[in-house]
Each structure stands twice: as C-alpha cells, then as structure tokens.
Amino acid sequence: MRSGGTLFALIGSLMLLLLLRMLWCPADAPARSRLLMEGSREDTSGTSAALKTLWSPTTPVPRTRNSTYLDEKTTQITEKCKDLQYSLNSLSNKTRRYSEDDYLQTITNIQRCPWNRQAEEYDNFRAKLASCCDAIQDFVVSQNNTPVGTNMSYEVESKKHIPIRENIFHMFPVSQPFVDYPYNQCAVVGNGGILNKSLCGAEIDKSDFVFRCNLPPITGSASKDVGSKTNLVTVNPSIITLKYQNLKEKKAQFLEDISTYGDAFLLLPAFSYRANTGISFKVYQTLKESKMRQKVLFFHPRYLRHLALFWRTKGVTAYRLSTGLMIASVAVELCENVKLYGFWPFSKTIEDTPLSHHYYDNMLPKHGFHQMPKEYSQMLQLHMRGILKLQFSKCETA
C-alpha cells in the first residue's frame, strides 16, 4: 500500500505540473518563445528595459518601445521645427539674395512640421497690428473716420492732398461695413499658378469670408480650384484702364464680369495716387447708375501708410506692399482663423514642376515694385508661428 500511495502521489504531481504548464504557456507559446529568445540575444547589446520585461511569462508583448520611439521622433521633429523657425527669422533679416531653390527647400522642410493655430501668438500679433494700423476702424474710408472738410493726403504721394467735399463724402459708407466681424474662418485667395489643379475651390467656398485680389476669373473650370464665393475683391485701377478702357467702350463687359462676384465689396485704392482717384470714382458711379449689387469701398490711405511702416520694421522695404500682404494683414484683424491660398511667388513647385505666375496668365509683376520673396518669408514665419496657415499644394478632397 505504501508503494501504491507513492505511485499515486507521483502521478498527481505530474498531472499538476502538466496543468500548470498548460496555464503558463498558451497557444501562442512558440511565437512568444521566439520573441524571448530574440530578446535574450539582443540583451547583451543594450536591450531596452521595456523589452526585458518579456522575461515575465505573464506580461503581454509591450508597446512601450514603439511609444518611446514615437515620442523621441516627435521631440526631434519639434526641435527641428524650432530650428527652422529661427532660420526663417534669419532668412528674412539678412540682406543677401536667396535663390528660389533656397526658399523651396525651406518650404519642403516646413511641410514636415505639423501646423496648429497658436492662440497666444495670434492674439499678440493681432494686437500689434491693431495698435499700429487698426483695420477695424481705418481699413476703408468711411463717413465716421473721414468727415466733410478733411484735407486727405494720398498714401504714396503724401505731399498731395484732396479735399473731401459733400459729393465725395457721400460715396463713403457711414461706418465700417463688416457687420459680422469677427469672422470665424477666412480665406485670402491669391492668384498664384500653384492654384491650378489644386482642387481647393470647395474648401475656399466653405469659409465665412473670402477675400480675392484684382478681379480674378472665378467661373467655368477655374472654380473647382479657386472657388466662387467672394465677399471682398480688390480692383487695381490699371485693370479698369487697360482691360476695360476706362469704362467707355467696354463698360458692358465690365458689368458682366463683376456680376460673377455676387454682392461682394469692390475695394479700390482711390487715394494712393492722384491718377487713381478719377477712375475709382468712375467705378463707383458706374455701379450706382447700373444698380449693381456690388458696393464700392476705398482703401484708407492712412491705414496703408501705417501698414507699410509696420512691415518695414520687419524687413519689407519695397516701394509698395503687394495687395496680397495688405489683405492678409486685414484678415488677421477681422478674422479668428486665416488661411492663404495661391500665395506662391515662385516659377515652379517643390517637385520642380513649372508654374505660370498667375493661375489665369503668366504676366509678371513690375521688377522692384513689390518685394515678393521678403514678403513671402514673413508669411512663412506667420505660418510657423501658428498665426495663419499657408496652403502649399493641392487641397484634400472628401
């Protein structure tokens, strides 16, 4: 009996061991064993602490190694983006001429940086703009900021003046016409060739307020890339003179063309040069006589002078700011979120694909009149600081 009891005890112990092994080593034991063996081989060459925990059979395969790796990569990207922002500051402050390829390489690097709106940066920059320029009160000429009897000096020809009499005064809105300010989402649409085949139209049209520059075409096939919604469009008086022949023979064509902008404001620099005044007033009279839906506004010369001084302190010293930079500056004051489309002063994409200067033609600006690379480096800085967002390529479509 004693030997029989010993045999039963031995059998019981073996069964217990077998049961424990089954509990200890589930069906994935072979794969886990390979992982453990690989871990033991790696341990001598600096295995991470997370991987060493695999030696505990009850510990699941950890994900901490990947998480740590991703955290490290994120930190590296953040540091590189900070360095890039510093480099942009240097780029805009230096006087030496940078090549187009230098800028394109910088933009390639910027695209690797995640973009997030930075509320504090935005508020600080907007406060500085408001302090110097005050678009809310002074962006356009109004009866409130320019009473009858004002002897208004021109923006560029500052020694020249125009007295504001009743007939001119009544062309002005009573106050600033942007009644829904601040707008949540604003799109400032430039005319760069980068917009061709961008498919940004739907995204642009979802914006609460859309700014456009210099009466660009927005109908037909162009609308899928540039959208059609327009709340404000600038008008360069030279367009009225050259394209529409001072609204004499081509008045009907002008009225037909601007009808595509719905009830948008038409913004003209009537008081930048004396030569602009008469033709700008003629646009106003033409729309009034034809009972058009669009309303004419005039840039306030004081606002433009102050804005030029603001950007001059940041290195933009060209003869005159581009319309795009003017409107982007206005948008920062009027809007909570600003996105720029079609701002691309380069002859090719970052993939080296040739581009036309505008999405509708290849007419180049006057040499030396604007300072596009300097302006663009400032816009890149605003992008990197989370103040506004630049669209560099095609838009994502649903």
UniProtKB/Swiss-Prot annotation:
Disulfide-bonded cysteines: 186-335, 200-395
Protein name: Alpha-2,8-sialyltransferase 8F
Pfam families reported in the protein's UniProt record: Glyco_transf_29 (PF00777)
Positions of substrate binding: 214, 236-238, 322-324
Any one Gene Ontology molecular-function term assigned to this protein's record: sialyltransferase activity
Catalytic activity line of the entry: a ganglioside GM3 + CMP-N-acetyl-beta-neuraminate = a ganglioside GD3 + CMP + H(+); a ganglioside GM3 (d18:1(4E)) + CMP-N-acetyl-beta-neuraminate = a ganglioside GD3 (d18:1(4E)) + CMP + H(+); a ganglioside GD1a (d18:1(4E)) + CMP-N-acetyl-beta-neuraminate = a ganglioside GT1a (d18:1(4E)) + CMP + H(+); a ganglioside GD1a + CMP-N-acetyl-beta-neuraminate = a ganglioside GT1a + CMP + H(+)
Keywords from the named record: Disulfide bond, Glycoprotein, Glycosyltransferase, Golgi apparatus, Lipid metabolism, Membrane, Signal-anchor, Transferase, Transmembrane, Transmembrane helix
Cytoplasmic topology ranges: 1-3
